[in-house]
Regions:
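Short, well-ordered loop/turn and helix-capping segments at boundaries between secondary-structure elements
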Residues: 1-2, 30, 34-37, 81, ...
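Residue-level preference for alpha-helix termini and adjacent loops
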Residues: 8, 12-16, 42, 47, ...
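Short secondary-structure junctions and interdomain/linker hinges
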Residues: 16-19, 35, 39, 54, ...
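PLP-dependent enzyme catalytic core of the Aspartate aminotransferase-like
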Residues: 49, 112-202
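Generic non-transmembrane alpha-helical segments
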Residues: 53, 57-61, 88-96, 141-145
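Conserved PLP-binding catalytic core of the aspartate aminotransferase-like
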Residues: 64-132, 195, 199-201
C-alpha cells in the first residue's frame, strides 16, 4: 500500500485480524474473480447436467434416490437395496477408486454413523471434463461394485455394519474401468505421469 496508509494497514492486518486469514481472503478473491467468468458459469451448468444424468443413470439400476433426483450438484442414494449400510458402500467404492460419503437418510434406521445412504456429486468429475455420457459409465461402475459387495461379519460371526467382503477380482475389474475413464479425462495432461511414478512412487 501507499506509505501514508502503511501504519494503518499494518495495525489492522494482521495485528488485529482474527478469523479471516489473509491467505483465505486472497483465495476467495481469486474464486470470486473466476466465478464471474463465462467459463465458470459454463462449468457450473455442466455440473448440474452431469448430476442429473448421473441421477437418471443410477435410477436405471433401481437405486432409489432421495427426492427422486437432483437439481444441484449432488444426490443421495439409498444403498440398502444392496443389503449394505452407507459405511459399507463407501468402503467398497473407496477400494475400487471411487470417492463417496456415507450419508444418513431421513429417519435412518442405521443411524447417523452407519447410515443407509451415500452422497455422490459431480463437481470433480466435471472439472476432469466428463459429460453426461460418462455419467452412465460412472453409474454402471457404482452398481457393479455394490452388487458384488457383501456385508462382513464380526469376530463372533454376527453381521457387521462397517465391514465388507469384496473380491480381488471385483476390485481389479472396477479399478480398470475407473482408470480407463480417468485416462480419457486427464486433469493435468502436461504432466509426465510415467516419469513421476518412476521417480516418486515406491
Amino acid at each position: 500500500c501507499e506509505e501514508e496508509y502503511m501504519d494503518y494497514v499494518n495495525k489492522g492486518c494482521p495485528m488485529v485480524l482474527g478469523g479471516p486469514l489473509g491467505h483465505v481472503m486472497a483465495a476467495k478473491a481469486i474464486a470470486f474473480k473466476e466465478a464471474n467468468t463465462p467459463a465458470y458459469q459454463a462449468w457450473a451448468a455442466q455440473v448440474v447436467k452431469n448430476a442429473q444424468a448421473l441421477a437418471e443413470a443410477l435410477k436405471s439400476y433401481d437405486i432409489p434416490l432421495q427426492t427422486g433426483g437432483t437439481d444441484n450438484h449432488l444426490m443421495l442414494a439409498d444403498v440398502t437395496v444392496y443389503g449394505l449400510t452407507g459405511k459399507q458402500a463407501e468402503a467398497a467404492m473407496f477400494e475400487c477408486g471411487i470417492t463417496a460419503n456415507a450419508n444418513a437418510l431421513p429417519y435412518d434406521k442405521n443411524g447417523a454413523w452407519w447410515t443407509s445412504g451415500v452422497r455422490l456429486g459431480t463437481p470433480a468429475l466435471t472439472t476432469l471434463g466428463m459429460n453426461e455420457e460418462d455419467m452412465k459409465e460412472v453409474a454402471s461402475i457404482v452398481d457393479f461394485v455394490l452388487k458384488n459387495t457383501k456385508p462382513g461379519v464380526t469376530k463372533e460371526g454376527k453381521p457387521a455394519k462397517g465391514k465388507i467382503v469384496i473380491s480381488d477380482e471385483t476390485k481389479a475389474a472396477a479399478r480398470e474401468r475407473v482408470n480407463k475413464l480417468l485416462g480419457a479425462h486427464v486433469l493435468y495432461p502436461e504432466l509426465d505421469l510415467d516419469f513421476l511414478k518412476k521417480e516418486f512412487v515406491k
